[in-house]
C-alpha cells in the first residue's frame, strides 16, 4: 500500500504529475544503473533499453461462442487464442445437458485444453519477431476441424499442433515456462465502460529487485529456453527487445446487442486460459451466477498429465477419467485467483453487476 511504502507513494505522485513519461525520462538512468549494478553477467541493462521501450496497442482476439462474442488478449499473450479455441472446440457438444457434475464434461474440457495448448506451444509468440497465424488459429472452420479430434469416449493419445491458414514459417515447439506472480482485476464503471486487466511480474516478487517502491519483473523466464529444435526456430525463443509469450487472458463477453455481459480473467500462469474458459462455460452453458462459475473446480492438462483440484467434485470422477484414458492424473491444492463481473438485468430493466471472486482466496470484492 502506498501509505505504508513511502517510495512507492513518491513514484505514484511523480506519475500523476508527469504521466508515464516519468518512467522514460526522469527514472530511466537511475533505473538502468540500479539493474546493471545488481546484474553481474554480461548484457547489463543500459539507459537506452529503458528509453527505447514503448507500450503497444494491439488488436484483441475475438470469436463467437453460442450467441456471444468473446474478446481477449492477442499475441504475445496466448490467452485470447487459447480461450477462443477451447470454447470453439466445445461448441458442438451439449454442455448444458452434461452440466458441471458430469465426468464427460470434464473429459471434453481436458481434450479441448490439450488441442489448444498444442497450437499454443508451436505458434504463439511476439508478432514483431515471428508471424503468428492468429486469424487462422481462431477461424471457425479450423477450430471445428480440430474439434473432431475430441471423442466423448476416449482421450487423445497425443495432441499435436494443427496447420491453420496463414502459417508462414516452419516452427518447432518450445518448452513450457512456469509462470506465476500475476494479478487480475475487473472493473465496470457507472457508464458501462469495462476493463479486464491482467498484469504480472512473472515470479513471486519478480526478480527480487526493489526500485523506487516496487518490484521489478523477471519476465525473461517466460521465454522458451530452447531456441530451436531440428533446425527449426521456436516461436517463443529469447531475442533482444522481444516480448515473451504469456498466458494472460483478460476477457470481455458481449451479447448479440453488443452489450457487455461478462468481464472475466484470472491469475495463475498457464492455468489462466483454462480458468477463464471454465468461467465462461459456467455462465453461458450451465446458467450459473458468476460466483458459482468462478467457484467451479479446476482441472488442467499439462501434456499427458492431468491435475485437478483436491477435494472437489472431480475427485469422484478420477476412476472414470482414468477409464477414458487420462491415466496420469493426480490432485493438487489449488491456489486460484479468478474474478468476474456479470451484468444482471432486473424485471424492470434495472442493470446491476454481480461481483465474483474466487472462493479459494481471502480478499473481498464489492459493488457500489
Where are the regions that the model predicts?
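Alpha-helical support elements that line or immediately flank enzyme active sites
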Residues: 17-24, 29-35, 88-91, 266-288
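Short, well-structured alpha-helical segments that form the helix of a local strand-helix-strand
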Residues: 26-32, 101-117, 290-300
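Extended C-terminal subregions enriched in glycine
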Residues: 191, 241-244, 276, 285-333
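Short, small/polar residue-rich loop motifs at catalytic or cofactor-binding pockets
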Residues: 57, 179-182, 246-248
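Active-site rim segments in enzyme catalytic domains, especially the processed small/beta chain
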Residues: 38-46, 188, 193-257, 262, ...
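Structured, charged N-terminal subsegments at the starts of enzyme catalytic cores
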Residues: 33, 37-111
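Non-catalytic, conformational "gating/processing" segments within enzyme and secreted inhibitor domains
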Residues: 1-40, 120, 127, 154-160
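Internal maturation/activation junctions in enzymes
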Residues: 5, 43, 92-200, 331-332
Amino acid at each position: 500500500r502506498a501509505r505504508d511504502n513511502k517510495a512507492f507513494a513518491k513514484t505514484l505522485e511523480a506519475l500523476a504529475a508527469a504521466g508515464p513519461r516519468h518512467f522514460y525520462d526522469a527514472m530511466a538512468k537511475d533505473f538502468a544503473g540500479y539493474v546493471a549494478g545488481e546484474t553481474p553477467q554480461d548484457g547489463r541493462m543500459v539507459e537506452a533499453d529503458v528509453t527505447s521501450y514503448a507500450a503497444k496497442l494491439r488488436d484483441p482476439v475475438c470469436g463467437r461462442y453460442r450467441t456471444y462474442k468473446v474478446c481477449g488478449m492477442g499475441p504475445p499473450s496466448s490467452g485470447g487464442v487459447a480461450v477462443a479455441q477451447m470454447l470453439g472446440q466445445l461448441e458442438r457438444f451439449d454442455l448444458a445437458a452434461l452440466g458441471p457434475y458430469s465426468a464427460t464434461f470434464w473429459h471434453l474440457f481436458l481434450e479441448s485444453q490439450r488441442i489448444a495448448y498444442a497450437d499454443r506451444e508451436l505458434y504463439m509468440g511476439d508478432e514483431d519477431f515471428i508471424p503468428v497465424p492468429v486469424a487462422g488459429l481462431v477461424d471457425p472452420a479450423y477450430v471445428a476441424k480440430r474439434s473432431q479430434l475430441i471423442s466423448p469416449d476416449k482421450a487423445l493419445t497425443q495432441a499435436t499442433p494443427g496447420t491453420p491458414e496463414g502459417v508462414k514459417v516452419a516452427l518447432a515447439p518450445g518448452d513450457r515456462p512456469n509462470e506465476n506472480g500475476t494479478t487480475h482485476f475487473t472493473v465496470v464503471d457507472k457508464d458501462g465502460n469495462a476493463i479486464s486487466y491482467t498484469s504480472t511480474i512473472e515470479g513471486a516478487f519478480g526478480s527480487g529487485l526493489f526500485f523506487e517502491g516496487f518490484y521489478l519483473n523477471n519476465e525473461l523466464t517466460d521465454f522458451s529456453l530452447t531456441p530451436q529444435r531440428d533446425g527449426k526456430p521456436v516461436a517463443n525463443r529469447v531475442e533482444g527487445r522481444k516480448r515473451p509469450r504469456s498466458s494472460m487472458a483478460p476477457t470481455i463477453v458481449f451479447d448479440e446487442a453488443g452489450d457487455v455481459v461478462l468481464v472475466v480473467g484470472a491469475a495463475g500462469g498457464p492455468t489462466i486460459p483454462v480458468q477463464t474458459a471454465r468461467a465462461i462455460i459456467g455462465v453461458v452453458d450451465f446458467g450459473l451466477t458468476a460466483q458459482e462459475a468462478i467457484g467451479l473446480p479446476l482441472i488442467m492438462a499439462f501434456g499427458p498429465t492431468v491435475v485437478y483440484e483436491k477435494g472437489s467434485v472431480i475427485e469422484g470422477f478420477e476412476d472414470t477419467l482414468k477409464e477414458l484414458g487420462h491415466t496420469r492424473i493426480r490432485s493438487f491444492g489449488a491456489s486460484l485467483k479468478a474474478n468476474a463481473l456479470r451484468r444482471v438485468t432486473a424485471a424492470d430493466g434495472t442493470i446491476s453487476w454481480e461481483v465474483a471472486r474466487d472462493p479459494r482466496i481471502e480478499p473481498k470484492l464489492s459493488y457500489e
